[in-house]
Amino acid sequence: MKTLRLNNVTLEMAAYQEESEPKRKIAFTLNVTSETYHDIAVLLYEKTFNVEVPERDLAFRGEMTNYSTSLTNLYEPGAVSEFYIEITEIDKNADS
């Protein structure tokens, strides 16, 4: 499992893909539990991130360009959902 940092928050990815043309883009899966759902949702609402993938020596400013989840009701204790997220590089001076 690879480690990802979004805006200085460390996350453990269950799956990971990387592209570099025409812009850097990562796609990854997170297993989100009912206990971690709120914190992950608040983070993802930021939409624009400082992205770091230490194992790949990769760092860039990016925006979430795709998102899906396997389960929408994470309010039940013990529930786990697979979040699929894509983040694409943006201009370093861009801000949303």
Curated annotation (Swiss-Prot):
- The protein's name: Uncharacterized protein YkvR
> Mind telling me which SUPFAM superfamilies this protein's record contains?
YkvR-like
Q: Which domain of life is it from?
A: Bacteria
Source species: Bacillus subtilis (strain 168)
